Structure formats: structure tokens, C-alpha cells
């Protein structure tokens, strides 16, 4: 399994859309995504890269393993 590293925000947004999330709103420099069946929204900031801790937290919210995450990234 590859190590999680920061990725570009645009790439992470493509990943979120691929797994069925839609942009609900923006507040300041935060983008809030949602998908039916989630307990809480997925939040990312308007930074150039998404840090590892935000990726890991959002994968936990989405109930997606890191292996599945890397497989999806290869597909998109």
C-alpha cells in the first residue's frame, strides 16, 4: 500500500465527485460536500494541496479505505 501524501485540491474534488459527493456550499475558504447516507459533511479548504490529516479524516467520514482511495485515484 502506498503512503498517503498531500494531493492537489482539484484532484481530491474529482475524487469526491467520483464517489457521489456534491458541493453543497462554501463558507470562507471551506468547501462543504455532502452525499446521502453520510453522518457528517466532507470539508476541504481552498488550499493548493489537501494535507494528509484532512484526507484521512474525510476517508473516515466516507467509509473508504486507503486502498480503495488509491484504486479510485488510479481510475480518475
Spans of model-derived segments:
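Basic nucleic-acid-binding interfaces
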Residues: 1-29, 34-76
Amino acid at each position: 500500500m502506498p503512503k498517503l501524501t498531500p494531493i492537489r485540491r482539484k484532484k481530491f474534488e474529482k475524487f469526491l465527485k467520483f464517489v457521489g459527493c456534491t458541493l453543497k456550499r462554501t463558507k470562507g475558504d471551506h468547501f462543504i460536500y455532502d452525499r446521502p447516507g453520510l453522518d457528517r459533511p466532507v470539508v476541504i479548504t481552498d488550499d493548493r494541496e489537501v494535507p494528509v490529516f484532512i484526507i484521512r479524516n474525510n476517508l473516515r467520514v466516507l467509509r473508504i479505505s486507503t486502498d480503495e482511495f488509491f484504486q479510485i485515484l488510479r481510475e480518475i
